[in-house]
UniProtKB/Swiss-Prot annotation:
The chain crosses the membrane at residues 20-40, 54-74, 82-102, 107-127. InterPro entries: P_starv_induced_PsiE (IPR009315), P_starv_induced_PsiE-like (IPR020948). Belongs to the PsiE family. It is found in: Cell inner membrane. GO terms for cellular component: plasma membrane. It is a multi-pass membrane protein. The keyword NAD does not apply. The keyword Repeat does not apply. This is Protein PsiE homolog. Keywords: Cell inner membrane, Cell membrane, Membrane, Transmembrane, Transmembrane helix. One of its GO terms (biological process) is cellular response to phosphate starvation. Its main location: membrane. HAMAP family: PsiE (MF_01048).
Amino acid sequence: MAKNSRSQWIAKNLQRLLNVGLIMLAAILVVFLVKETIHLGKVLFLSNQETSSYMLIEGIVIYFLYFEFIALIVKYFESGYHFPLRYFIYIGITAIIRLIIVDHENPIDTLIYSGSILVLVVTLYLANTERLKRE
């Protein structure tokens, strides 16, 4: 019985440590989200027309990445300390879209990135079917 209670104590304390780390990470991400909001405002209102559209689109996608990571952490606490797979897939899709927007020089690379998005969308569809859905 002593081993079982010790294991539970270790698991509970590691869970607390993980929770504190995720709360600190969420706070850092909120700071970056605010900084990105300020950056988007500067790009929107203070930049010249030629470069501002690309910078604005890239900034918006980065903004969504921060937003999705924060939403993932919130969902972790709401779902009883569980990371839903579909949020990681959303983050992956958004990150690849950002990569396509930023680096679209090589058409073969862009095609490979697009294929990766297709694989992630199919994975998202499969993860949301009734057999695999946990939520």
